[in-house]
Amino acid sequence: MTENRIPLAGVIGCPIAHSKSPQLHRHWLKTYGVDGHYMPMHVEPEDLESVVRMMPRMGFVGANVTIPHKQSIMEIADKVTDRAKLMGAANTLIFHEDGAIVADNTDGYGFITNLHEGAPDWDAKSGPATVFGAGGASRAVIASLIEAGVPEIRLTNRTRSRAKEVAQTFGSKVTAVDWVEAGNVIEDASLVVNTTSLGMTGQRRLRVPLDGLHSGIVVTDLVYNPLKTELLQAAEEAGCTVVDGLGMLLHQAVPGFERWFGQRPEVNSAARDAIL
C-alpha cells in the first residue's frame, strides 16, 4: 500500500446487516480525525477466498470477520496466530504490505478486558468459573480465563460431547459438566459466564436453575440484546456483580483498529452509545 492511499478496513460476513462494527469503527474514525474508511461487506462462503485475496490489492489494511466465516478464514490466511488456533476461530485480519494475510482472534482480549473493567474487584485466583456453552465464544473465554489464572473451569453445554471436546483441548483445568447439572456448579463459583445465544432477543430462554447465585459471585453474559438479560436480572437481584456483554464487543475491536489506523481508541460511554 502506498503511503498516500487512505487505509480501508471493513467487516466480512453473511449476512452482514446486523453487524455493529461499522457504527463503532466509524465513530472512532470521526472522533480521532483519522483519514480512513470502514465498510460492511456481504460475502458468500464460496466467494470468501477470492474476495479476501483481492482486498490487499484494493488498499485494505485489514478486516473483521464474523459469522459464518470465522473458522473457514483460517484455511485461507497465510498465517494464523497461536491464540486463533487455540480458539478455533479468527475474527481479525491483518494485511501486510506484501499481500500476506494474518488471521488473529481478539475475542478473548475483549472478554477479559470487559470483565476487569466491569468487575474491578474480581480476582481470577479466588475460585472456579462456571461457563455455559461450548462454541467459538466459549473457547475465547476459557483461553482468557486460564491465562488470567482461574484455577478451575466448569464447562457445561446442551450437547455434552462438545463440552468434553473443548475441555480436552484446554486440559486438566477444564471439566465438562452435564447441562442438567448446570445449576449445581454455580453456588461455589466466583464467576459465571454465559457464552450461548440463550436469552438473546428472538432466541430461547436460558433455562438453568439460578437459585445458587449470591453476593460475591460475578456474573457476565455475552448476549447484549437485550443489554440486561434474564440471567443478569436474576444475578442483580441476588446481589451479584453483573457485567453486560456490550463491552466485550467494544474491547475486542480495539486491537484491530489500532493496527489498521495507527490510533488506539478509547472504550467509553460515547463508544457504547454509538452502537446502541
Swiss-Prot record:
UniProt KW keywords: Amino-acid biosynthesis, Aromatic amino acid biosynthesis, NADP, Oxidoreductase
Alphabetical list of Pfam families matching this protein: SDH_C (PF18317), Shikimate_DH (PF01488), Shikimate_dh_N (PF08501)
Membrane-spanning intervals of the chain: none
Binding-site list for shikimate: S19, K20, S21, T66, N91, D107, Y224
Catalytic activity of the protein: shikimate + NADP(+) = 3-dehydroshikimate + NADPH + H(+)
GO biological process, one term: amino acid biosynthetic process
Record pathway: Metabolic intermediate biosynthesis; chorismate biosynthesis; chorismate from D-erythrose 4-phosphate and phosphoenolpyruvate: step 4/7
E.C. number(s) listed in UniProt: 1.1.1.25
GO cellular component, one term: cytosol
Residues given in the record as NADP(+) binding sites: D82, G133, A134, G135, G136, A137, N157, R158, T159, R160, S161, R162, L222, G245
HAMAP family: Shikimate_DH_AroE
Protein name: Shikimate dehydrogenase (NADP(+))
UniProt source species: Ruegeria sp. (strain TM1040) (Silicibacter sp.)
Phylogenetic classification of the source organism: Bacteria, Pseudomonadati, Pseudomonadota, Alphaproteobacteria, Rhodobacterales
The gene coding this protein: aroE
